[in-house]
Regions:
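Conserved alpha/beta enzyme-core scaffold
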Residues: 2-169
């Protein structure tokens, strides 16, 4: 891993999980280039004629969404420590034999300790977001296959807006 010294004297990696990183150069020393990320334009042709997008189960929904190895899955933290949905989501991902998922949550909670087995077997490659409780301990101990990227709620928004992270599902 190549390290360079940033503007505050810290050595930081030039690449994380295969993606080039720009070290902090100081205030007003770096001007990002590019455009904001944008979602595709949807129209009625993209949906069933009757308007009903409900499918029979989570695996069917993931298949229809085109889930493949290496994609980014984002989840929201509104259910907090009662979030069984994310656990069911990754149970389905595992059953589909999908690997190397980047999980991009707005937050994680102790209930997500269920996902450690998927970090161990490669279903989830790494997490970019908060890593609390047992997940935080697991990642702090260096057990995750990829490098965890700790993002604040606002930092997450900026990464999406600036196109640094593309959410697939």
């Amino acid at each position: 891993m190549k390290l360079v010294k940033n503007a505050v004297g810290r050595f930081v990696p030039t690449e994380v999980n295969g993606e080039t990183q720009i070290p902090f150069k100081g205030v007003d020393k770096h001007k990002p280039t590019g455009v904001k990320a944008k979602p595709p334009i949807r129209s009625c042709i993209d949906y069933p004629e009757d308007g009903n997008k409900v499918v029979k189960d989570l695996k069917t929904a993931l298949k229809k969404a085109g889930l493949k190895d290496g994609m980014t899955i984002s989840t929201h933290h509104h259910l907090r420590n009662g979030d069984a949905v994310t656990n069911m989501l990754f149970d389905a991902v595992k059953e589909m034999r999908i690997k190397n998922i980047r999980w991009f949550p707005t937050a994680s909670f102790p209930v997500h300790s269920h996902l450690i087995k998927y970090l161990e077997d490669g279903t989830i490659h790494h997490i970019e977001g908060s890593m609390n409780g047992p997940l935080g301990k697991f990642t702090t101990e260096g057990k995750m296959k990829g490098v965890g990227v700790l993002r604040s709620h606002g930092g997450r928004y900026a990464a999406i807006q600036d196109g640094e992270v593309h959410i697939d599902i």
